[in-house]
Amino acid sequence: MKPDAHQVKQFLLNLQDTICQQLTAVDGAEFVEDSWQREAGGGGRSRVLRNGGVFEQAGVNFSHVHGEAMPASATAHRPELAGRSFEAMGVSLVVHPHNPYVPTSHANVRFFIAEKPGAEPVWWFGGGFDLTPFYGFEEDAIHWHRTARDLCLPFGEDVYPRYKKWCDDYFYLKHRNEQRGIGGLFVDDLNTPDFDHCFAFMQAVGKGYTDAYLPIVERRKAMAYGERERNFQLYRRGRYVEFNLVWDRGTLFGLQTGGRTESILMSMPPLVRWEYDYQPKDGSPEAALSEFIKVRDWV
């Protein structure tokens, strides 16, 4: 089937609505919407929930941008895209909870198509979700990865292990020699066997995110915490900032294409701290995190 960008766009708009409704149901606070237009073509809807009952900040962004030429970040990766017009659309979200025992989560689903007269379109889907705990709970990690595995199974036995490994490899801070979190799923350049199959998988990922995340939020949101845990959460949020600004392809693509900076940087935590040569106390829960986030098979 020929790629249907309109169908994808409608799914993404509905997905943004659904996820915002689900997060509001857990938190009680409402999202504020900011609709925007991109001068070079396209626009989007940025939605932010701030200082809620559970979430310090949650951002759920829909964007649909188009242009006559590809940016350097994309043509370096895919030289066959040079000289083509493009459309890129997606939903991207990051949730930063108040409680340090509730992990930060990120999800993204996206579609890209590049066309020129007289040639077949070049298109692909991408996306996934990943979890960044500050304090590790095995039952949470197992639930997260089991949900990811189960949504992948209808698409093939090898899908979950392949996209889990890709996620582990992608969300890695080379300059720190550590994972960003415990991973999940990550896929890019997905265009086989055909459009319908790939679109169905992207829909499963988009819908599976809240199935994976919200039970963990419910389990941890009322746990008591103090200044020690909060300080550690703010320190570890620094890793999130470092990854997004140094390594994340999506952030670089957005900034290089003249994307909307406020929306691109909506993933940043509202508060964060760095501390020179921080070393957690031996045997402390904080010290245990470095071992917990090492790559392993959770299911």
Swiss-Prot record:
Family designation: Belongs to the aerobic coproporphyrinogen-III oxidase family.
Q: Which SUPFAM superfamilies match?
A: Coproporphyrinogen III oxidase
One of the GO biological process terms: protoporphyrinogen IX biosynthetic process
Q: What does this protein do?
A: Involved in the heme biosynthesis. Catalyzes the aerobic oxidative decarboxylation of propionate groups of rings A and B of coproporphyrinogen-III to yield the vinyl groups in protoporphyrinogen-IX.
Q: What is the lineage of its organism?
A: Bacteria, Pseudomonadati, Pseudomonadota, Gammaproteobacteria, Enterobacterales
Q: What reaction does this enzyme carry out catalytically?
A: coproporphyrinogen III + O2 + 2 H(+) = protoporphyrinogen IX + 2 CO2 + 2 H2O
- Gene (name only): hemF
This chain belongs to the protein called: Oxygen-dependent coproporphyrinogen-III oxidase
Name the species this protein comes from. Escherichia coli (strain 55989 / EAEC)
Q: Where is this site: Important for dimerization?
A: 175
Enumerate the PANTHER family for this protein: COPROPORPHYRINOGEN III OXIDASE, MITOCHONDRIAL, OXYGEN-DEPENDENT COPROPORPHYRINOGEN-III OXIDASE, MITOCHONDRIAL
Specify which residues bind Mn(2+) according to the UniProt entry for this protein.
96, 106, 145, 175
Q: What class of enzyme is it?
A: oxidoreductase
